[in-house]
């Protein structure tokens, strides 16, 4: 069977997908636990991940949906990064293919973990291997041209919204990933808003002819989701927004439902109401990394209680 694991890390995101054929995809890595604090209920994410990997020291795909700390904390301490020797060796976990939105390559003025991961993304993109960049804004072509690289030579590393990611397919892996966002316009402005330009995908798993669908939505806001729904329905691709499990956007923030925060409930826009109330299928589970800690009625986000897809 395939397994999807959500981890109890509070207002942050990490999701590990383990396929029946042994391949893995990790969406974000945010080790938020305060070391040494016995009262911190968040899990030791590095330990949990290493326990899942066992003797393996490489993950097929590691996706950083965007470069906010609550999606990449301690990544540079845990993963082997190709661009600098100080991030290599020891028992660091290797990344076969890194998935990032174009904003992770283009954003300027970043610091800390974000700067390190941006440097790694740029290095892999310029080298032409080990990376997939989502969306193709004009600024990405300009980035390459300034470094004397013909953009046409990197087209195979770029996936546009509305297309499948080539690293996995249903026939051989029992899963396919459909990219909904970011759109090129999200990554083409002078000021990049990370949440708006984050990676939003639908994973379709198949076992013995039965499909299970998962939506991973990062921290996108209601306007971005509204656009995704509008474009998907216009193209008659409603099935690409069906879901059995959905990772609640932005750690359950009201801003991922509608423009105004309600006193008890936030009213969704019409398109979001359609997504959440009509597109959920038989299994219908909502996942939040903070659910286990806060007692919310979502699927428990614990590595010892994974969602088995069969």
Q: How would you describe each model-predicted region?
A:
Residues 1-58, 197-222:
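Conserved beta-strand hairpin/beta-sheet module of binuclear metal-dependent hydrolase folds
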